[in-house]
Amino acid sequence: FQIARMFPMWMEFAPSALSIVVWVGAITAFYAASVACAQSDIKRVLAFSTISQIAFMMVALGASLPAHSSEGILDNHAQLGYMAGMFHLFTHAMFKACLFLGAGCIIHAVHSNEMSAMGGLRKYMPITHITFLICCLAIAGVPGLSGFFSKDEIITACFHYSPVLGWWMTLVAAMTAFYMFRLYYGIFWGKDNEAYVEHRPHEAPWTMTLPLIVLSAVTLVGGWIPFGHFVSAAGTAYDIHLDAQIAITSSVIALLSIGLATYIYMGKTQPVADKLEATFPRLHRWAYKRFYMDEVYQFVTHRIIFRYISRPIAWFDRHVIDGFFDFLAWGTQRLSLCIRGLQNGSVQAYAFVFAVGALLVFLIMIL
């Protein structure tokens, strides 16, 4: 959001930095989507999905081309990327909030975050099921829902920036549809979990389901809001339009990804995580471990920064910086002791010091 607010400054003074924003966002989107495909904790799936979707927004901002018309106004391609990123910020806030709240209702019902402790919940939680499905369809980019419009605009901006970037983000969008419906089928389809015998799941109270209904309703109609009339990089209205070829291609790919997830997971009795692990054991382990980014972070921070950077800096701070100020304090104390000796209450001593001082001033004046 800060990049979006400061976007005119980026375009004017650092347009080359937007290229870094584009490719860092593209790599982050793919990384987070890959990790989400292997997680079994529903909150982690949604968390990495959020990382991926925020990366989508960053890519859109970076893909805003720094070109200007003769009047000095940003061209349509530049406005498209900016508008698409902010539009996706709005639509994503709606359906992702609904998904997280729905996950809270599910965890409240089964007392677990793991998909292995779920299954068949559509019979027990109909409202949560329908609202969750609507938001999964939206984030997957199914035509007509809010996520389709904003994500399609981002992909269009990416194709204007670079065909490679456009296809890359289309792949990430396909992965998004796949892992979201992997999550959906793992929670609401399949056979009932054995734990349901002792603790039967139930729908959340209306205080929890009412926000789901409101957010899913906004998700249904949010894409039809003329967002371009409110937000554009140049501060002028920008009419949203769909590139038919890109829209059809991205829609078909999203539906194929949903179909693949449906074929693999719908109605199956084997736990979701076990299927991926059995089919791609090594790749699944890498993705489940988040490609060992946590271990890399721990190594860099503890083995390198703390040992070879932080410790020398701490020694320098303790012995040099603190030592210098300790020396100043010691010197000031010693000087005060010496000066305090002059204040002995003897008038003769005061007169002597005054005379010596006056003599020194006289000598300085005549010399």
Sequence positions of predicted segments:
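Alpha-helical transmembrane segments of multi-pass membrane proteins
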Residues: 139-144, 220-227, 262-266, 362-366
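Hydrophobic alpha-helical membrane-embedded segments
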Residues: 96-99, 174-183, 254-275
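Hydrophobic alpha-helical transmembrane segments of multi-pass integral membrane proteins
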Residues: 2, 132-133, 212-222, 257, ...
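Hard-cation-handling environments
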Residues: 201-260
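Hydrophobic transmembrane alpha-helices and their helix-loop junctions in integral membrane proteins
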Residues: 1-203, 216-218, 224
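Hydrophobic alpha-helical membrane-insertion segments
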Residues: 135-139, 211-226, 290, 305-315
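Aromatic-capped, Gly/Pro-kinked transmembrane alpha-helices
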Residues: 228-246, 266-367
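Select subsegments of transmembrane alpha-helices in polytopic membrane proteins
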Residues: 50, 205-217, 326, 347-353
